[in-house]
């Protein structure tokens, strides 16, 4: 049962009783538990967002209701926990973050299932949050929550990360020995960039500025041109274009990432050389042509951008790699060539998408498809 005090707070907040507060009232509001972050607490029923002072629901620092609950649980703010549950926050998220026995008991009294403290439930919750793309809520629950991270079995934990990441993190952090904490953070950060979840990206970039270069690399690798443009031109985060291009080339069918690096000044012939070396490496690992279709698509796209397969360095590479008959045949027969739609270097993300869409519509790729079919 909720106290009269909690119910009174609920009514006052919902009716925006503190929207025009005086600075002298701030201490009293804090003592009464009516303060959130840097101002009087507010709640938007429509958006289910907890806000502070004059903050809007779309503000990067606004909290979804379940995130606000997790924060209140971590800070042992009893009345706020009850208040957020009244607004239908999921108390099961709270019990996962309770730091004291008293708060844990309160969560159970409010309806939390104690089974959510079991390893299996914690693991399943992680998977469910991936499906729902609740990046910030997941980070609030799992990041810096040593009890949860240590409760995961080492094999299961890394199997989950590797399955969804497909080795991606290690491709960008080969020399870094990451803790579970860092692995979890980068896992969710990558998810936000992959699906272009603007608010989580902005929130995380503000909270973890030491990962700015990593963020740009990730955006390039995944072909998120909106984030590349934002990091590069609005935040002045810069990396050498050819280095960025080498990352873009490694992600299958990454036309957006490759084009953007090309428009920034990366050498397209160097990109083609990188891809040929990669394909040769895969051939020696006995990975078939067909399973590497996405990388072959990148090769085709680089040539469409003007890369010259007849350069001395590329021809020398082809001569050395006797096993890669397909590539030699492809280049020797002249099946591929530059595409006129790609001769301009555009950096505005929406225009880049239009160019790539037009290219994909007009580029039939018949010769490449025919070659592939004849080799089956």
Swiss-Prot record:
**One GO-annotated biological process of the protein:** taxis
| Pfam hit, one | ASFV_360
Role this protein plays: Plays a role in virus cell tropism, and may be required for efficient virus replication in macrophages.
Indicate the family of this protein: Belongs to the asfivirus MGF 360 family.
This protein is called Protein MGF 360-7L
């Amino acid at each position: 049962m909720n106290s009269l005090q909690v119910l009174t707070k609920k009514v006052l907040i919902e009716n925006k009783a503190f929207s025009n507060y005086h600075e002298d009232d701030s201490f009293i509001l804090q003592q009464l538990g009516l303060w959130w972050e840097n101002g009087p607490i507010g709640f938007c029923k429509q958006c289910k967002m907890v806000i502070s002072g004059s903050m809007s629901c779309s503000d990067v620092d606004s909290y979804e209701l379940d995130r606000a609950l997790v924060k209140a649980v971590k800070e042992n703010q009893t009345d706020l926990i009850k208040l957020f549950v009244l607004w239908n926050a999921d108390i099961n998220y709270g019990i996962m973050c309770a730091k004291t026995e008293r708060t844990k008991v309160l969560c159970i009294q409010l309806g939390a299932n104690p089974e959510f403290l079991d390893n299996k439930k914690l693991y399943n919750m992680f998977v469910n949050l991936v499906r729902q793309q609740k990046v910030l809520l997941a980070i609030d629950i799992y990041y810096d929550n040593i009890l949860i991270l240590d409760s995961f079995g080492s094999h299961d934990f890394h199997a989950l990360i590797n399955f969804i990441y497909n080795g991606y993190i290690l491709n960008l952090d080969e020399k870094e020995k990451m803790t579970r904490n860092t692995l979890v953070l980068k896992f969710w950060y990558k998810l936000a960039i992959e699906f272009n979840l603007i608010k989580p990206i902005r929130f995380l970039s503000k909270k973890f500025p030491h990962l700015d270069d990593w963020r740009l690399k990730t955006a390039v690798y995944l072909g998120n041109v909106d984030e590349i443009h934002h990091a590069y031109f609005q935040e002045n985060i810069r990396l050498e274009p050819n280095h960025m291009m080498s990352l873009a080339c490694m992600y299958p069918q990454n036309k957006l990432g490759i084009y953007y690096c090309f428009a920034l000044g990366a050498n397209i012939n160097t990109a083609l050389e990188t891809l040929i070396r990669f394909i040769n490496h895969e051939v020696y690992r006995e990975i078939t042509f067909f399973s590497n279709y996405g990388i072959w698509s990148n090769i085709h796209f680089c040539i469409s951008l003007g890369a010259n397969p007849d350069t001395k360095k590329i021809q020398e590479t082809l001569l050395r790699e006797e096993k890669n008959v397909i590539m030699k045949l492809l280049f020797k027969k002249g099946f591929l060539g530059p595409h006129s739609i790609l001769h301009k270097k555009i950096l505005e993300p929406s225009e880049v998408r239009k160019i790539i869409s037009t290219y994909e519509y007009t580029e039939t790729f018949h010769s490449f498809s025919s070659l592939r079919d004849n080799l089956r």
